[in-house]
């Protein structure tokens, strides 16, 4: 090899051409190294994905907690509204009953007085 060309561990040297078994060994080593590099890359991607998943799960958990708190507040508010509507309905029924009683008294009392003479 001349000093002007950079060193390449996968390039064949003059001595390697004379030994084909050494070439096979180096190509097999290069294949294994490429496979290892691919596996390392995949594992790094998997680790990053797991970390992102953990962050998303934490975010979802926080949102679920907030939703549970909001649901409890909504339930309390709904119960207050239900009780207020029940009370209004009761007052309306009592007023209606009172009006009916007054109308009956206004109608029945003059008739009773008229027939009692």
Swiss-Prot record:
Residues 1-30 are annotated as: Disordered. Palmitoylated by SWF1. Keywords: Coiled coil, Isopeptide bond, Lipoprotein, Membrane, Palmitate, Transmembrane, Transmembrane helix, Ubl conjugation. One of its GO terms (molecular function) is syntaxin binding. A lipid is attached at residue 95 (S-palmitoyl cysteine). InterPro entries: Synaptobrevin-like (IPR001388), Synaptobrevin/VAMP (IPR016444), V_SNARE_CC (IPR042855). Gene3D superfamilies: 1.20.5.110. Residues 112-117 are vesicular. Belongs to the synaptobrevin family. This is Synaptobrevin homolog 1. It comes from Saccharomyces cerevisiae (strain ATCC 204508 / S288c) (Baker's yeast).
């Amino acid at each position: 090899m001349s000093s002007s060309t950079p060193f390449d561990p996968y390039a064949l040297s003059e001595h390697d051409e004379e030994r084909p078994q050494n070439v096979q060994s180096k190509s097999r080593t290069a294949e294994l190294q490429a496979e290892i590099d691919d596996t390392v890359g995949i594992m790094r991607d998997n680790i990053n994905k797991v970390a992102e998943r953990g962050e998303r799960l934490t975010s979802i958990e926080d949102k679920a907690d907030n939703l549970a708190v909001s649901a409890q507040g909504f339930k309390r508010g709904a119960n207050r509204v239900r009780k207020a509507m029940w009370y209004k309905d009761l007052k309306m029924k009592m007023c209606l009953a009172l009006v009916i009683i007054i109308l009956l008294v206004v109608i029945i009392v003059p008739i009773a007085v008229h027939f009692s003479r």
